[in-house]
From Swiss-Prot:
It is found in: Membrane. GO terms for biological process: retrograde vesicle-mediated transport, Golgi to endoplasmic reticulum. SMART domains: DUF1751. It is a multi-pass membrane protein. PANTHER family: PLACENTAL PROTEIN 6, TRANSMEMBRANE PROTEIN 115. This is Protein pdh1. Residues 63-65, 119-191 are cytoplasmic. Residues 1-26 form the signal peptide. Keywords: Membrane, Signal, Transmembrane, Transmembrane helix. The keyword Nucleotidyltransferase does not apply. The chain crosses the membrane at residues 42-62, 66-86, 98-118, 192-212. The keyword Oxidoreductase does not apply. Residues 27-41, 87-97, 213-226 are extracellular. The lineage of its organism: Eukaryota, Fungi, Dikarya, Ascomycota, Taphrinomycotina.
């Protein structure tokens, strides 16, 4: 069985993350070496700044979900997708896993943008309108939460049995790390994305997943080759 087939949603997510992160890193290096320019600012709006960029480039609300700001978060994302994402995709199938990832890429960003906009209206601080949220944090938190819901509750049979004893603590560790980031002067939005990704994943598994299974007559695809 191939770890990733040509139809794998996980494979496509990994490609997007590496590609967008590389572009983002390249832009950052260009700015440090050559200074800012109108062209660089244009690309920054495409990949970085939300919600300022949202008014000019609506797709940034999605693209920012596939850009990691540093090597640590990128490696963490690759690991979580390659291990836990594969498990969920194998169980749910490609189509539902894609739907699940769409929930995790759009809704958490909106959940962060709304309080930013409200706070801006109250304080009139333009800093709040430049909330950097380029991060796969919501996707990682959502996948970890869904995996915990599926396998730790013995609803499905996990092929990675050595991970089951740790599943109870993974999401709490993940949230704790991102809360620690806030105290280390990292953007507070990362923690907000982690929390919103966790909540959305909980709601999806409890309410949306059973409905999707019923509507489309889907069954568990534990042997799906991905």
């Amino acid at each position: 069985m191939n770890h990733f087939s040509k139809f794998s949603v996980t494979k496509r997510l990994l490609i997007l993350e590496v590609l967008f992160s590389a572009i983002s890193f390249g832009i950052s290096i260009y700015i440090k070496v050559f200074g800012r320019s109108s062209i660089v600012t244009f690309f920054l709006l495409c990949f970085h700044l939300v919600p300022n960029a949202l008014f000019l480039f609506p797709w940034t609300i999605i693209t920012t979900s596939f850009v990691d700001a540093n090597v640590f978060t990128l490696l963490s994302s690759i690991l979580i997708l390659s291990v836990y994402g594969v498990e969920i995709e194998r169980s749910w199938g490609h189509k539902e896993y894609l739907l699940f990832c769409q929930f995790l890429t759009v809704i958490p960003n909106i959940a962060v943008l709304i309080p930013c906009f409200i706070a801006y209206k109250i304080t009139d601080s333009h800093y709040l309108l430049v909330a950097i949220i380029q991060s796969t944090t919501a996707i990682q938190a959502g996948i970890l939460t869904a995996w915990y819901q599926l396998y730790s509750c013995k609803k499905e049979e996990s092929s990675n049995k050595f991970l089951c004893p740790l599943s109870k603590y993974l999401i709490y560790l993940f949230l704790s790390i991102h809360l620690f980031y806030v105290f280390q002067s990292f953007p507070w939005t990362y923690f907000c994305l982690a929390v919103s990704g966790t909540c959305i994943s909980e709601l999806y598994v409890l309410f949306v997943h059973p409905v999707v299974q019923e509507l489309f007559h889907l069954e568990s695809h534990t042997q799906l080759p991905i």
